[in-house]
Each structure stands twice: as C-alpha cells, then as structure tokens.
C-alpha cells in the first residue's frame, strides 16, 4: 500500500489583472511561514493560521492595494485553498472531521470542519466595528469563503462572544487552524482508506 503521508505538498501560482499570488504549503510541516501580502494585519492572521495548523506556508501576494485590500485577501484565500486541495490529493487516510472551541482572553470562537471535498461556509461572526486599524473586518469572511470554496471543505465558524474585534478575528483564524490540523492528520486506523462509505470524497 502506498504511503499516504508522502509529499503532502501543494504549490499554486495565480495571476489576474488585480493580483499575482504564489503559495506553497506542506500539510505535514511544523507551522513555519513566510508571508508577504502587503497587508500587515492580514499577514499577522495568516501567520496564526500557519503556526496553529502546523501547515508550512510560503505566501507572496502583489495586489491592487491602491484600490483596497479586497482582491488581495480574497485571491490569497483562493490560492491557499487550491494549494491545500492539491496537497490533500484524494484525501486518503485523513481524519476528516474536527471541531474546537478556542478561547483568547474575553473571546470564544467555535470552528468545525469536514474535509469532504464539498465546499461550504457557515459564518456566524459579527464585528462591532467595520475596521481593525485600516483592515476591513468584512474581509475576514471573504477570506474564509475563498479558502473553503477552493480547498473543498465544509467550514462552520461561530463567534460565541467577545468584545475586542482583533481578538474575534484572531480566534477565527486560530480555531480554523486547529481544526484543519486535526482533520487533515493521517489516521493510522484508516489504513490508507478514503474516510467515506462512498469510497470517495468529492
């Protein structure tokens, strides 16, 4: 039987009239990241995503920031999702499901994921301010929508409570990171099988 843990890496380069994005990921990494999107707060969040998922990420985005951050954030999410999907391949042997409540000071956020091959986002997060510094808070959802769609995952994110918008955003990234870490891990009891009675995840 083939080693399902062999080379779980993915690389994507994506260029449009609005952005140029290059992403490489290693699902079986240690959370090392090299990130440059031109958007400081977003870089900080992506660093959290890599660190707590233990997925190594190298991300370089050049976007039309003279317009706003939207295209940069969304297209980076698309490319990360595509790279993760490539790295997972047919998803053979993975744990598949995970959920977690994550605390950060006064904030609690819940994330649940099914690495199913079927993209869907349920988003129950509200920010009390339209911006964190200069970053539009609505872009947090846009990022996760792009990630879920292109990684082929069903993702639920719910902020249970929290007063600080930075903490709310950060717990979204950290909780999603932790469930991705668990759900994409190889389960030795699966013995290399696809974790579905259908025999495929699509």
Swiss-Prot record:
<keyword id="KW-0368">Histidine biosynthesis</keyword>
<dbReference type="InterPro" id="IPR038494">
    <property type="entry name" value="IGPD_sf"/>
</dbReference>
<dbReference type="InterPro" id="IPR020565">
    <property type="entry name" value="ImidazoleglycerP_deHydtase_CS"/>
</dbReference>
<dbReference type="Pfam" id="PF00475">
    <property type="entry name" value="IGPD"/>
</dbReference>
<keyword id="KW-0028">Amino-acid biosynthesis</keyword>
<keyword id="KW-0456">Lyase</keyword>
<dbReference type="InterPro" id="IPR020568">
    <property type="entry name" value="Ribosomal_Su5_D2-typ_SF"/>
</dbReference>
<dbReference type="InterPro" id="IPR000807">
    <property type="entry name" value="ImidazoleglycerolP_deHydtase"/>
</dbReference>
<dbReference type="GO" id="GO:0004424">
    <property type="term" value="F:imidazoleglycerol-phosphate dehydratase activity"/>
</dbReference>
<dbReference type="GO" id="GO:0005737">
    <property type="term" value="C:cytoplasm"/>
</dbReference>
<comment type="similarity">
    <text>Belongs to the imidazoleglycerol-phosphate dehydratase family.</text>
</comment>
<comment type="pathway">
    <text>Amino-acid biosynthesis; L-histidine biosynthesis; L-histidine from 5-phospho-alpha-D-ribose 1-diphosphate: step 6/9.</text>
</comment>
<protein>
    <recommendedName>
        <fullName>Imidazoleglycerol-phosphate dehydratase</fullName>
        <ecNumber>4.2.1.19</ecNumber>
    </recommendedName>
</protein>
<keyword id="KW-0963">Cytoplasm</keyword>
<dbReference type="GO" id="GO:0000105">
    <property type="term" value="P:L-histidine biosynthetic process"/>
</dbReference>
């Amino acid at each position: 039987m083939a080693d399902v843990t062999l080379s779980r890496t993915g690389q994507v380069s994506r260029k449009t009239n609005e952005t140029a994005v290059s992403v490489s990921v290693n699902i079986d990494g240690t959370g090392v990241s090299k990130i440059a999107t031109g958007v400081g707060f977003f870089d900080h969040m992506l660093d959290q995503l890599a660190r707590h998922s233990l997925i190594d990420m190298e991300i370089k985005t050049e976007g039309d920031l003279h317009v706003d951050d939207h295209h940069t954030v969304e297209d980076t999410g698309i490319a990360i999702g595509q790279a993760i999907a490539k790295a997972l391949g047919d998803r053979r042997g993975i744990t598949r499901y995970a959920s977690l409540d994550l605390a950060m000071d006064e904030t609690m956020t819940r994330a649940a994921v099914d690495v199913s091959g079927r993209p869907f986002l349920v988003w129950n997060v509200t920010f009390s301010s339209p911006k964190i510094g200069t970053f539009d808070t609505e872009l947090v959802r846009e990022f996760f929508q792009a990630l879920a769609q292109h990684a082929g995952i069903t993702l639920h994110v719910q902020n249970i409570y929290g007063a600080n918008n930075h903490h709310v955003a950060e717990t979204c990234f950290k909780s999603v990171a932790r469930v991705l870490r668990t759900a994409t891990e190889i389960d030795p009891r699966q013995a290399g099988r696809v974790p579905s009675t259908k025999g495929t995840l699509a």
